[in-house]
Regions:
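A Zn2+-metalloprotease active-site environment signal
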Residues: 1-230
């Protein structure tokens, strides 16, 4: 909420009606499926903003239903509607799976372990540095990667059930990899799966998701507040 307020004060909330309508139509279909998956989220205050930050290739969704996407992602990735749906479905999946709260719990647990190691050592400064590194490698990074993998799985299903082509999840990450220039830390030092790992896993999910996408019938929408009203 504070982040959105900051961007509003800076005049960085996009008001272009065509772009806002595009984002609104996509997110309303995704949210309808999110509510089917977790009915209690019907009470969330679902809203989405487009933030004018051309250098930021990012999007997010918080528990409670507040979403945002940055113009840098739209401009640099140039996503199709199906690909843009995969982005937002992935972020909605993080909120549905409560990953923000899980990350806070993991961070608190690893910090407690680091502090305990420092207290018990006769060289507390050096020990705490080593313990912090070990905690990041052993706890924080694997948990972050697990959350990303789970969000990929939930997100591609949400998007397929909302009528968006699951094959776009693969092409999206091909584009993401191209924008990133192929530069990434080793997998064991990354909070995200590598692009290759991600594409392989998504490719494996596509055949299971195609029936949802190809299923006949109307795709419902759920109201989402759009633009400067959030």
């Amino acid at each position: 909420v504070q982040e959105i307020g900051k961007y509003r004060q800076q005049g960085k909330l996009v008001t272009d009606p065509r772009l806002l309508q595009r984002v609104e139509v996509i997110t309303e279909r995704l949210v309808a499926q999110a509510v089917k998956m977790r009915p209690e989220t019907a009470k969330w205050d679902w809203s989405v903003q487009v933030i004018d930050e051309p250098k930021t290739v990012n999007a997010w969704c918080m528990a409670g239903g507040r979403m945002a996407i940055y113009t840098g992602l739209i401009q640099k990735i140039d996503p199709t509607d199906d690909e843009l749906a995969q982005v937002m479905a992935h972020e909605i999946a993080h909120a549905l799976a409560n990953h923000t709260a899980e990350r806070m719990s993991v961070a608190m647990a690893s910090q407690a372990g680091v502090l305990a190691a420092g207290i018990l050592s006769d060289q507390p400064g050096q020990t705490m540095v080593l313990a912090a590194t070990a905690a990041k490698l052993a706890v924080d990074l694997p948990n972050s990667r697990t959350a990303e993998t789970e969000a990929d799985r939930i997100g591609i299903e949400l998007a397929a059930k909302a009528g968006f082509d699951p094959r776009a999840a693969v092409t999206l990450w091909q584009k993401m990899g191209a924008v990133g220039g192929g530069k990434a830390p080793p997998a064991f030092l990354s909070t995200h799966p590598t692009d290759a790992q991600r594409k392989d896993r998504l490719n494996a999910l596509v055949p299971k998701m195609l029936p949802y996408y190809q299923s006949p019938g109307a795709r419902p929408s759920h109201p989402v507040r759009i633009g400067g009203s959030a």
